[in-house]
UniProtKB/Swiss-Prot annotation:
CDD domains: BRO1_UmRIM23-like. Pfam families: BRO1. Belongs to the palC family. PROSITE patterns: BRO1. Residues 278-304, 414-441 are annotated as: Disordered. Gene3D superfamilies: alix/aip1 like domains. Required for the proteolytic cleavage of the transcription factor RIM101 in response to alkaline ambient pH. This is pH-response regulator protein palC. InterPro entries: BRO1_dom, BRO1_sf, pH-resp_palC. It comes from Yarrowia lipolytica (strain CLIB 122 / E 150).
């Protein structure tokens, strides 16, 4: 599991812009774009072959190639009036979310708008990949850099969603727009990145606590932030992942479990299966739903596409809810509500019990530390309650009804692409056009 989902980084087929576009005054812009795009293609191929997208990989060459190409393609897109399109542009890309196999076919996309959007899309995913690679590094500034790149990736996606090329695509018949490039998918990606940026705060606070001497004792908070703020931050992150899942069309029934044992009174919460299937003492009260059945449910949604992304969002929600209960427990302990602290810490442990992360994952150590912290907290709280307080321990479902509203603490970073050509033309008009606009005469 990574700090954000990136799927398979897109790859693309050759495309000669100089054979499709001409200009009396700005032919050099087209030639520069051609050369830069060729480097993008080579770097994407190289990244795929060498595992550059892995946590220990190096995605920076891909990012640099994309940053070299974007000013040229942006100049052409923003100043179509000074370029002549001699033939229809057909650009072929292997889509990142639907192409779960490295051998999946590339999808032909008609028009310069699709080329531009795929470049921006790929750039956002590459930035998110770089953020994940920073998380995997054992360096003090890793969280700062990871947060910066996640925020920038979200800024790129938000720019993509507002730009004229995307509006052109959105006005095309739905059948001609791949699911990866739909408005709902891009909106979901923005929400996912927003949630990921807030999760980084929670991971950073836990990491700083460990630097101060290991798993904190019962009364210790993380990173010097108030438990109230971290609680609401975790809820906000969790809600962002929930919104992303809803935008991708995952049915509510797939995100929530209502059993005869526990019936949720609020549609706001989606606790893990084990929270509902265990008693407060930890003993099972109903047969748990198997991971196979859970995966089968996910794989049957969204017409067989985007399943890996939905699965990632489900796990991300689970970890976020673990943080919610953790900081709920700390807040309760600070307020001398020892029984509530015991119940919340135990709910967090159950929430994270099924979260299995490979050792090579960037989040293996942070989540392992989180689990260790929760076990120690629960033991400390329970010892205090058994010896001194003797307070009743609320169930996870009762605690869930007490969640406050989430709080956004990181704003979106505004991003705009550079251009290599500025003619001062008015490009503010967003009148709908078809995606092949300017493709041929």
């Amino acid at each position: 599991m990574s700090i954000s989902y990136t799927g398979q980084l897109p790859t693309t087929s050759p495309l000669s812009l100089t054979q499709l576009i001409t200009s009396d005054r700005y032919q050099q812009v087209i030639e520069n774009a051609d050369a830069a795009r060729a480097r993008v293609r080579e770097q994407l191929k190289h990244a795929k072959k060498t595992g550059a997208t892995e946590a220990n990989g190096d995605i920076m060459p891909v990012i640099k190639a994309l940053e070299e190409y974007m000013p040229h393609i942006t100049s052409i897109v923003d100043n179509e009036g000074v370029f002549r399109f001699t033939s229809q542009i057909i650009t072929c890309w292997r889509l990142p979310f639907q192409s779960q196999s490295s051998m999946a076919n590339k999808t032909p996309l008609h028009g310069l708008s699709f080329e531009y959007i795929m470049v921006l899309f790929t750039y956002a995913l590459a930035l998110a990949t770089l953020a994940n690679q920073y998380v995997a590094r054992d360096k003090e500034d890793r969280w700062k850099h990871a947060s910066a790149y996640i925020s920038k990736a979200r800024g790129v996606v938000d720019y993509l969603r507002q730009c004229r090329s995307f509006q052109i695509i959105c006005n095309e018949p739905p059948a001609s727009v791949p699911r990866d490039l739909s408005s709902a998918t891009m909106s979901a990606l923005s929400h996912m990145l927003c949630g990921a940026s807030h999760m980084l705060i929670l991971y950073k606070c836990d990491a700083e606590t460990y630097l101060d001497g290991g798993a904190p004792s019962a009364g210790a908070n993380s990173g010097g932030f108030s438990s109230s703020l971290l609680l609401r931050t975790a809820i906000f992150a969790r809600d962002q992942f929930e919104t992303a899942s809803a935008l991708l069309g995952e049915p509510v029934s797939k995100r929530k479990l209502v059993t005869s044992l526990v019936k949720e009174k609020s549609s706001k919460f989606s606790l893990s299966k084990k929270l509902h299937l265990r008693k407060d003492d930890g003993s099972p009260s109903l047969a748990p739903v198997s991971s196979f059945e859970s995966n089968r449910d996910l794989s049957s949604t969204s017409s067989g596409t985007l399943d890996s992304l939905l699965s990632w969002l489900s796990r991300a929600r689970g970890v976020a809810e673990g943080f919610v209960f953790k900081h709920m427990a700390i807040q309760a302990y600070e307020n001398n509500q020892i029984g509530k602290a015991v119940g919340a810490a135990y709910a967090a442990i159950l929430q994270l019990e099924d979260v299995k992360i490979p050792q090579k994952s960037a989040l293996y150590i942070p989540v392992t530390h989180l689990k260790e912290t929760l076990n120690r907290h629960h033991a400390d709280y329970k010892a205090d309650n058994d010896r001194l307080s003797f307070e009743p321990v609320p169930s996870p479902s009762e605690l869930a009804q007490e969640w406050p509203s989430g709080r956004q603490v990181i704003s979106a970073q505004k991003w705009t692409p550079q251009t290599s050509l500025d003619l001062g033309e008015d490009t503010s008009s967003s009148a709908p056009k078809y995606s092949g606009q300017g493709s041929y005469y």
